[in-house]
Amino acid sequence: MDAKALWQRYQEWLYFHEGLGLYLDVSRMRFDDAFVKSLLPKFDKAFADMAELEKGAIANPDENRMVGHYWLRNPDLAPTPEIAQEIVQTLEQIEAFAEKIQTGAIHPPKANRFTDIISIGIGGSALGPQFVAEALAPEFPPLKIHFIDNTDPAGIDKILTHLRNNLASTLVLVISKSGGTPEPRNGMIEVKKAYAGQNLDFAQYAVAITSTGSNLDKVAQAEGWLATFPMYDWVGGRTSEMSSVGLVPAALQGIDVRAMLEGAKEMDDATRVPEVKNNPAALLALSWYYSGNGKGEKDMVVLPYKDSLLLFSRYLQQLVMESLGKEKDLDGKTVYQGIAVYGNKGSTDQHAYVQQLREGVPNFFATLIEVLEDRNGASPEIDPGVTSGDYLSGFLLGTRQALYENQRDSITVTIPQVNARTVGALIALYERTVGLYASLVNINAYHQPGVEAGKKAAAVILDLQTKVVGLLQKEKTALSLEQIAEKIGAADQVEAIYKILRHLQANQRGVVFQGNLGQPSSLKVSIS
């Protein structure tokens, strides 16, 4: 296609949202009109499915739950007055609490005000808040946030060491729907011990974000924590940024949460339009379907050309891959669906993996995120008439052109600036796209059986560890790995037992190996 034809195609397929100043360009996805026409019946069903979901239909049959993250930014859509009222009241409570923390009306026992936050959560309880903090937190926030998003002891130590002199003025958010998820539970216990080590009463620093009646909720109530905010069973982790999960940490950092909600609401309105060409989420879903033949055959590479959007690809990684990565479709057929997502930022990636994107395996499509405003204020000239921002824009446009010239497809999303409204809109845009695409390929976007399988497998390993250690503590002589496995009734778990013991030995847990470490079958094991 020559330059003139491309210009016409660009104009034909350009989507523009005037209120948000957002552009979506899918002209460099090489679908034709016949392809679009062939998908229209599927889109009719997808639009109908989405309308039913927003009305409160059971959209997650595995757990018999509604899916209502859209109600968070427009409570009038909620299926009952009680849900609508709770959404409104929770937002007001979040704003009031944040103001009291920031002004010192609520303050720690040994300081005039809180200066820092430790946010403990995993998955959607971390990725959304991390993305929003990186994108929107002011340079000098009223409280500086730090995340514990894993059960890695060294990672926890790094945060606690960094904050050791500020612990007495550090607020702790514990985010867990059940309170029993191992990663946040472990983080909470370790942080509690750190506070006790400085003779600080953890309850006077702690805030719970959890389901009403959960184990965490009961602990918070019994110990008298500073506050508790709800997590709803109709909001999944990966779509929870507009709930207490995301709004509490954002508000505490001084981010305009109402503007973020308003941006999401505007995008929700735009993505309800039942016409593919006039619905940005439908255009994205169309492009994803085209690129991967409706089977996820190509990866999505996300390149935001703005440092503050660095974590957008990680956020989308969970949203897209956890929603769409499914073995079975809604009819129970094995389909192995999903779209792999990765990325970092432009133009950094042009000096990393863009070489492969341009000339290597064509197993991807690119999503370029463009921000029109370079910075707040004027930019100095680097060359005559040229600024650093001009270079960044040139690199984006150049990458887009270079990819297309070599038959590599791309999508470009353009926003006027990075602010609370546009970030809210981006989140809402991709939430809706995932839902529409899932309908196109006939899968449930709102459950995650693979995650649950991983949790159960981890529990089996920890149970195995307890049995192994218990056996070795009773035995008076060293045993081979095979003997250990036989004695605890786990003859098929020799490799797992070896790896458990190797980890314990490396962490001075009393495990002693005799034999050749390079030949595990030669080892004799005891506990000192």
From Swiss-Prot:
Active site residues per record: 322 (proton donor), 351, 455
Record's catalysed reaction(s): alpha-D-glucose 6-phosphate = beta-D-fructose 6-phosphate
PROSITE patterns in alphabetical order: P_GLUCOSE_ISOMERASE_2, P_GLUCOSE_ISOMERASE_3
Pfam families, A to Z: PGI (PF00342)
Pathway terms, separated by semicolons: Carbohydrate biosynthesis; gluconeogenesis; Carbohydrate degradation; glycolysis; D-glyceraldehyde 3-phosphate and glycerone phosphate from D-glucose: step 2/4
InterPro entries: G6P_Isomerase, Phosphoglucose_isomerase_CS, SIS_dom_sf, SIS_PGI_1, SIS_PGI_2
EC number: 5.3.1.9
Gene Ontology BP annotations: gluconeogenesis; glucose 6-phosphate metabolic process; glycolytic process
Compartments (UniProt record): Cytoplasm
A GO MF label: monosaccharide binding
This protein's UniProt keywords: Cytoplasm, Gluconeogenesis, Glycolysis, Isomerase
GO cellular component annotations of the record: cytosol
Family: Belongs to the GPI family.
Purpose: Catalyzes the reversible isomerization of glucose-6-phosphate to fructose-6-phosphate.
Name of the protein in question: Glucose-6-phosphate isomerase
Source organism: Trichormus variabilis (strain ATCC 29413 / PCC 7937)
Lineage: Bacteria, Bacillati, Cyanobacteriota, Cyanophyceae, Nostocales
